[in-house]
Amino acid sequence: MEMAPAAQVASNPRTVEDIFKDYSARRGALVRALTSDVDEFFGLCDPDKENLCLYGLANGSWEVALPAEEVPPELPEPALGINFARDGMNRRDWLSLVAVHSDSWLVSVAFFFAARLNGNERKRLFNMINDLPTVYEALVDRKHVRDRSGVDSSGKSKHSTKRTGEGQVKRSRVVAEEYEDDDEEHNETFCGTCGGLYNANEFWIGCDICERWFHGKCVRITPAKAEHIKHYKCPDCSSSSSKKTRL
C-alpha cells in the first residue's frame, strides 16, 4: 500500500493559550506513538519505504507519512527518513532519537504559530511548554519520574490518590519495577490533556465516560472538589455531550 503525504492542515492558533493547546495535543500524540502505540509505530516505519516522518496532529492523533509535497511546506516538517535507521540501531536508541527530533519539531511548530506574538507572550509560551516533560523525557527518563514519585530504592511501590469510576477516592499504585524490556514500557499512565507521565505526588482524576486519566490541574479539579463529584466527565466528553444535546 502506498503511503500518502501527511495532510498537515493547521488550525492556525493565534493566542498563547491556543498555541499551547495545539502543542500539548501534538506532544501527547507523539508520546503515545512512542510508548503505548509503539508496536504499531515500529511496524509502520518500514525501512524499505521512502522518507517517512512521524507527525503529531492538532486533533491529538499521530501518523507516519511521507513529507508534505508543497515547497515550502505549510508548517515546519519533522525529521525525514526516521524509518531508514530503524533496523540498524538498538530499538530503544532509535526510539530515543525519534523522540529528540520530535521535541525539536514540536517547538518549531509552536514558534511558527507564535511569530506574531510579542516578546512577553513568546516568553510565557516557552515557560508553559517548558513546564511539561519533553517527549524524550516521557520515553526514557523513567527513573527520574519514579524518583520524583517517591519510589524508594528497594523497588516497592508507593501510593497516591486517584478516583474510581464510582466517584470514590482510592489508593492506586505506581509500579516501581525496572523497565528491562520494551514490553514493560507500555504500561504507563499518561494525562489525557498534556500527555505527561503519572506522578504519585500529583492529584489525578479519571473520566467515567472515556476512562482516561488527567492531572487535576489540567482539568481544574482539586482533591476537595473531587470528593463531591459522583461521576466525573472530562472536558472532551462534556463537550461531546453538549453537542449531542444541541442536535
Swiss-Prot record:
Q: Name one Pfam family in it.
A: PHD
Its name, as the record gives it, is PHD finger protein ALFIN-LIKE 3
Q: Which cysteines are joined by disulfide bonds?
A: none
| Lineage, top ranks | Eukaryota, Viridiplantae, Streptophyta, Embryophyta, Tracheophyta
Zinc finger (PHD-type) residue numbers: 188-240
Any Gene Ontology CC annotation = nucleus
GTP-binding recorded as keyword: no
User: Do you know which InterPro entries this protein is assigned to?
Assistant: Alfin, Alfin_N, PHD_AL_plant, Zinc_finger_PHD-type_CS, Znf_FYVE_PHD, Znf_PHD, Znf_PHD-finger, Znf_RING/FYVE/PHD
Q: Which SMART domains match?
A: PHD (SM00249)
Organism equals Oryza sativa subsp. indica
What compartments host this protein?
Nucleus
Q: What does this protein do?
A: Histone-binding component that specifically recognizes H3 tails trimethylated on 'Lys-4' (H3K4me3), which mark transcription start sites of virtually all active genes.
Instruction: From the UniProt entry, list the residue stretches annotated as the region Disordered.
Output: 147-178
The alphabetical list of record keywords is: Chromatin regulator, Metal-binding, Nucleus, Transcription, Transcription regulation, Zinc, Zinc-finger
MF annotations from Gene Ontology? histone binding; transcription cis-regulatory region binding; transcription coregulator activity; zinc ion binding
Assembly and interaction partners? Interacts with H3K4me3 and to a lesser extent with H3K4me2.
The alphabetized list of GO BP terms reads: chromatin organization; regulation of DNA-templated transcription
For this chain, the family text in UniProt reads: Belongs to the Alfin family.
- Relay the domain remarks: The PHD-type zinc finger mediates the binding to H3K4me3.
